[in-house]
Swiss-Prot record:
It comes from the Bacteria. Coiled coil: none annotated. GO terms for molecular function: ATP binding; UDP-N-acetylmuramoylalanine-D-glutamate ligase activity. SUPFAM superfamilies: MurCD N-terminal domain, MurD-like peptide ligases, catalytic domain, MurD-like peptide ligases, peptide-binding domain. The gene is murD. Its main location: cytoplasm. The lineage of its organism: Bacteria, Pseudomonadati, Pseudomonadota, Alphaproteobacteria, Rhodobacterales. Belongs to the MurCDEF family. GO terms for biological process: cell division; cell wall organization; peptidoglycan biosynthetic process; regulation of cell shape. It comes from Cereibacter sphaeroides (strain ATCC 17029 / ATH 2.4.9). This is UDP-N-acetylmuramoylalanine--D-glutamate ligase. Pathway: Cell wall biogenesis; peptidoglycan biosynthesis.
Length: 465
């Protein structure tokens, strides 16, 4: 645990008692603060009381008298589409609002570091797609190289549940836009921006607000090194804003398709090969086609981002290459479930938006595509250019009929349920084809989260194997 510093003897309200909320309460208490907890769920409140915490109704009048700070969980809206009433009450009372990420950055460094030979470092990864894989890949590479490392944030543990830093340790954090938007302190040593595509726009008031939330990680006084994906306009803009000149090697540009040879430092993938260029010279080349845990161009972009981040931390190209080869991938992200009769079954349940689904569809030449769920703003019409590899679509969930109207002449069948979609796709698939779950939609119409959707797909597939 990382005790929260600077709030000794102060009352701190905590809103939202999920994983991060309870971890925050423990860290506040360990640092000498008095946490006052609240959640709309009676079950969550009872669980907190069972752990010995004080539960206080933050919805009542004058609830914030004498309170120094409100710490809120990332899933609770603080501005758009409308502020949570408790957050609105805190802001009206002049009480600052923060989250566990902000508390982490104000508390991570300690006096113990004076005795360290090598200062601990923090690497933060943000973006629309590939954050989790990139974060896990950086952590894996560091571990394989023998560097002490911990991983947390939007993946794995809550940040305040981490152990205090060791000599030379690297903490790798995945940060969503919800987390970067509200954190009052963001001071990573290395920051990674993978890409940007429309997502969570209701929470940010539009695309501009969404990009602004991500960009906060790179604010003045932020990272020593920035790794920026430049395959979208926002990444190009951000890299330009952070660079003093094209040869500035504090910014490492990455791409999954473009040649980037003219910049101070770049890492890019083309035709299955990763190349590192620095000041006009090629420094390394890696064959990504031999990496079983990193299929497709989208994973090649993740590999470029992780490679660049690890190079800034002093790892050698061959160390990184060896670790890339041993990376098994993450569940629900281009995850091979099995193969039968020459037909491969792949679970990419995390492909919840158009951009991530497009990248999944580009990874295989012949696809039986299972898609649908709770559609997002804008639908899936933008996927039209990527449907050439789709032999047939099997549509499920709330948006099945809407999706059918948006995929044009692509052969399709409305299946409604995962069970029927898997059965029909498996029945019709031919050797050499891939049955791919890449929903291009949220899961909440039929499942509590994308993980449960992916698990259901895998269960149905394994029953057929």
């Amino acid at each position: 645990m990382i005790p929260v510093r600077g709030l000794e003897g102060r009352k701190v309200a905590v809103l939202g008692l999920g994983r991060s909320g309870l971890a925050t309460a423990r860290a506040l208490e360990a640092g000498g603060a008095e946490p006052l907890l609240w959640d709309d769920s009676p079950e969550a409140r009872a669980k907190a009381e069972g752990q010995g915490f004080t539960v206080t109704d933050l919805t009542r009048e004058r609830a914030f008298e004498g309170v120094a700070l409100l710490v809120t969980s990332p899933g609770i809206p603080h501005l758009y589409p409308a502020p949570n009433p408790v957050i609105a009450r805190a802001m009206a009372a002049g009480v600052p609002v923060d989250n566990d990420i902000g508390l982490f950055f104000r508390s991570f460094a300690t006096r113990d570091w004076d005795a360290f030979d090598q200062m601990p470092r923090v690497v933060c990864v943000t973006g629309s797609n590939g954050k989790s894989t990139t974060t896990a890949l950086i952590h894996h590479i560091l571990s394989e190289a023998g560097r002490p490392t911990q991983m947390a944030g939007n993946i794995g543990r809550g940040v305040l549940d981490l152990d205090p830093a060791r000599d030379g340790e690297v903490v790798v954090l995945e940060l969503s836009s919800y987390q970067t938007d509200l954190a009052r302190a963001l001071t990573p040593d290395v920051a990674v921006f993978t890409n940007l595509s429309p997502d969570h726009l209701d929470r940010h008031g539009g695309m501009g607000g969404y990009f602004a939330a991500k960009r906060r990680l790179f604010a003045e006084g932020g990272p020593d090194r920035a790794v920026i994906g430049v395959d979208e306009p926002e990444g190009l803009y951000l890299a330009g804003q952070l660079s003093v000149a094209p040869e500035d090697d504090r910014v490492i540009r990455i791409s999954a398709g473009q040649k980037l040879e003219r910049f101070g430092w770049s890492v890019f993938a083309r035709k299955g090969f990763l190349a590192e260029w620095r000041k006009g010279r090629q420094m390394a080349s890696i064959d990504l086609r031999a990496m079983p845990g990193l299929p497709g161009a989208h994973n090649h972009q993740n590999a470029c981002a992780a490679y660049a981040a690890c190079r800034t931390l002093g790892l050698a190209p061959r160390q990184i290459e060896a670790a890339l080869a041993s990376f098994a991938g993450l569940p629900h992200r281009s995850q091979t479930v099995g193969e039968k009769g020459g037909v491969r079954f792949v679970n990419d349940s995390k492909a919840t938006n158009v951009d991530s689904a497009a990248k999944a569809l580009q990874a295989f030449p012949k696809i039986r595509w299972i898609a649908g769920g709770l559609g997002k703003d804008g639908g899936i019409a933008a996927l039209q250019p990527h449907l050439g590899s789709v032999v047939k679509a099997y549509l499920i969930g709330h948006s099945a009929r809407d999706f059918a109207l948006q995929i044009g002449a692509t052969d399709h069948e409305i299946c409604e349920t995962m069970e029927r979609a898997v059965a029909r796709a498996a029945e019709e698939a031919q050797p050499g084809e891939v049955v791919l779950l890449a929903p291009a939609a949220a899961s909440f119409d039929q499942y509590p989260n994308f993980e449960k959707r992916g698990e259901d797909f895998m269960e149905k597939v394994k029953a057929l194997l």
